Amino acid sequence: MPNVKLPDGNVKHFEAPLTIYDVAHHISPGLAKAAIAGRVDGVLVDTSYLIKEDCSLIIVTEKHEDSLEVIRHSTAHLLAQAVKALFPSAQVTIGPVIEDGFYYDFAFERSFTPDDLSLIEVKMHELAKANLSITRRELPRNEAIQYFKGLGEEYKAKIIADIPENESLSLYRQGDFEDLCRGPHVPSTGFLKAFKLTKVAGAYWRGDSNNEMLQRIYGTAWADKKSLEEYLYRLEEAEKRDHRKLGKALDLFHFQDIAPGMVFWHPKGWTIYQELEHYMRNRLVDFGYQEIRTPQLVDRSLWEKSGHWANFRDEMFVTETENRHYAVKPMSCPCHVQIYNHGLKSYRDLPLRLSEFGNCHRCEPSGALHGLMRVRNMVQDDAHIFCTEDQIQSEVAMMLELVQSVYKDFGFTEIKYRLALRPEKRVGSDDVWDKAETALKLAMQGRNIEWVDAPGEGAFYGPKIECSLSDCLGRIWQCGTIQVDFSMPARLEASYVAEDGSKQTPVMLHRAILGSFERFMGILIEHYAGKLPLWLSPVQAVVLTISEKQNEYAEKVRKTLQKRGVRANFDLRNEKIGFKIREHTLQKIPYLLVVGDKEVENCQVAVRTRDGIDLGVMTIDTICDTLTQEIIRKGSI
């Protein structure tokens, strides 16, 4: 008879098999009422799951981290049930859980409208309020195919037909609706209290553009209404901060169909870009990097040697001329090895730190393109360090110091670190992997960094550290990477002469901090809602005249600011000062310097911030000092 070990270490002995619900009720009726699911020996299951033998058990309530997956999966079924109730001719396909929510794809003769979504949501609340029991049963594969064909659900029958014949399938029923699903699900629809349908979009059947178009309804679901409201607020804020909208409103960049996924930088946007590049270049010099430049078009022979042609070919832009095949580089690593290989290297030359603002192209699917966040042409702050195995720890420690310093200057202090460890299929001996993984851990410990291990998620050629930023809405953006590579140097015949005179292969460390300039700019724009820190703002101050009598003085103020390194402009238009202030505030210019007759007479400016704060009057020297000091401080405000 089963012994059940609970999270607190307590072991409960039972005389007969029993369900997770029964165990919860044995502990307390309140726990049984709150139980959503269970985790038996690490596997997530329904509360109706029958425990027949000894196991460890976690009872999942809405407070447990597993609860949202179960709630969202069940809400996807609730959505499908509501759609079938309102639109019986609609056919169901799949409805998985995604980040922060779920979706369900339907085949229907017409497009769902916003009014339809409202009706569907009302019906979902009605079904949830009915507190319908959710039950599970199993069917053999062939019976399941015939069952769904009998319901007119051809798509579901096709899905089942792809499953091996000897498999038994699970179906979940709630009321008069039944769907194919592995589960688990909540015990009844009454557990689904906080959800919202967010949008409808097109989606190809099985993700293939040659197949018919389906309709995908997206939604979100949470354990309670407070969490739902907080999420919807974040969603609303994210919509306001959308870098594509702000990019247009602030005249930073645009995209066109003539160059999908490639940015047309406007003067203001290019100013930000150049500031990023200038900043990174200076930081890299401080840390001993040598900047290089490698070709855009490279013969396929290099990509074949590096392994990219076999594994990355579909994502490369290729061309042919004079009977030779070339690829536009999707990454800079193989080219950096060519520079390393140019000339004999000794152990005394290591570590060798090479950096490039690598202009790369990748043939991303058109449907995946998303403003600056997903592009086909990107510039990466790419660097590769060639070193010995014994130098890995010290080099990684130096990289982490640089990463933390750079992110701080951009105003990001909450950094999450993840250590991707060896996968089953890998190159290199266990001893080498032990050494590399230990070096990465010790480097992080030396910087007082806390991290999460990700077993099995390293690349086949080495472990890596992933550095992710948390923005003002709590969204996580993976930007930085520190990757150990045991493979590419050997594939491309990189070597050095060791102290004992032997020929050795160096370790290659791939390193990016921003990731791509384009994506990082998108993150910055959304994080700051367009109100970039002073040092990054394309226009840092604008001088506003009250009348044309101050034009000459305004020009003098602007020139003085520019000589002190401030990006300044002026507005001499014959418009009311209130109109000018509003217009430049909407353009999110950090400082508005108003000049009238009194300011001209006293050689001063009246200073306002873009947030409407009146800083009073200042002399020209004072405002210059104020702005230049803030620019120097960067994110340390």
UniProtKB/Swiss-Prot annotation:
Zn(2+) binds at C333, H384, H510. It is an enzyme of class 6 (ligase). Its EC number is 6.1.1.3. Disulfide bonds: none annotated. Residues 242-533 are annotated as: Catalytic. Its main location: cytoplasm. InterPro entries: aa-tRNA-synt_IIb (IPR002314), aa-tRNA-synth_II (IPR006195), aa-tRNA-synth_II/BPL/LPL (IPR045864), Anticodon-bd (IPR004154), Anticodon-bd_dom_sf (IPR036621), Beta-grasp_dom_sf (IPR012675), TGS (IPR004095), TGS-like (IPR012676). It catalyses: tRNA(Thr) + L-threonine + ATP = L-threonyl-tRNA(Thr) + AMP + diphosphate + H(+). One of its GO terms (biological process) is threonyl-tRNA aminoacylation. Residues 1-61 form the TGS domain. GO terms for cellular component: cytoplasm. Binds 1 zinc ion per subunit. It is found in: Cytoplasm. Its cofactor is Zn(2+). GO terms for molecular function: ATP binding; metal ion binding; threonine-tRNA ligase activity; tRNA binding. Keywords: Aminoacyl-tRNA synthetase, ATP-binding, Cytoplasm, Ligase, Metal-binding, Nucleotide-binding, Protein biosynthesis, RNA-binding, tRNA-binding, Zinc. Belongs to the class-II aminoacyl-tRNA synthetase family. Catalyzes the attachment of threonine to tRNA(Thr) in a two-step reaction: L-threonine is first activated by ATP to form Thr-AMP and then transferred to the acceptor end of tRNA(Thr). Also edits incorrectly charged L-seryl-tRNA(Thr). Homodimer. This is Threonine--tRNA ligase. It comes from Legionella pneumophila (strain Lens).
